[in-house]
Amino acid sequence: MTQLEAIAFDDRGVPLTGWLAQPEGEPRAAVLVFPTIANVTPAIERRAQMLVDRGYLAFIGDFYGEPVPDFAAAQRLAAALRGDVDHYRTRLEANLNTMRNLSAATGLQLAAIGFCMGGQAVLELARAGKELAAVVSFHGLLDTGRPARAPVHPRILVCHGDQDPMVPREQVMAFWQEMDAAEAHWHFHAYSGVKHGFTDPASDSRGLAAVGYDASADRQSWAAMNNLFDELF
């Protein structure tokens, strides 16, 4: 297991902590990993390790800068963060800029991936015109308070559970139209019968009807990301 290194930074005076994991040898690229609404968890740390195993530098972002003791607290913190688009995007950009400015990331191409709220976060970076090679959203929310406008720089991959009640088909169709209008280069993978949170085996133990693990969708979505990254990096 690769050792995670704490990286302190801030956003407009709010102290934040990212977590850096580095491969042996020269990284193929630097990948920002945005967590779920619960912020950094063992599941997200495992994803960082999986990226390191494939030769990438991984930097786990921090949404809140404070502990998340339970789901109610996560909902409160997320609502406060996402309630204003400018506030939300500035926090996301602080994470991206911190990774970009790491000495270990000098000269590397940049990508971002995210899960649940993190999936929405990487799409917001793309919408904001950030110069990334790729963004990948796993069971991310697709709505936004500020739709994308050209140019959209990164390649976009969305991996979506078709039975995710948090992202109804109307939202999916609106996202497609938004991406086309912005002339984005996008891929959209939908998995039939699959719920929200399909990449996390712990989803089945949360007692929430909206979420559930799906081993096949988990494998296929990660493979889709790897295929895209292999093409780019």
Identify the function of each model-found stretch.
Residues 168-178:
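Short alpha-helix in the alpha/beta-hydrolase fold that links the catalytic acid
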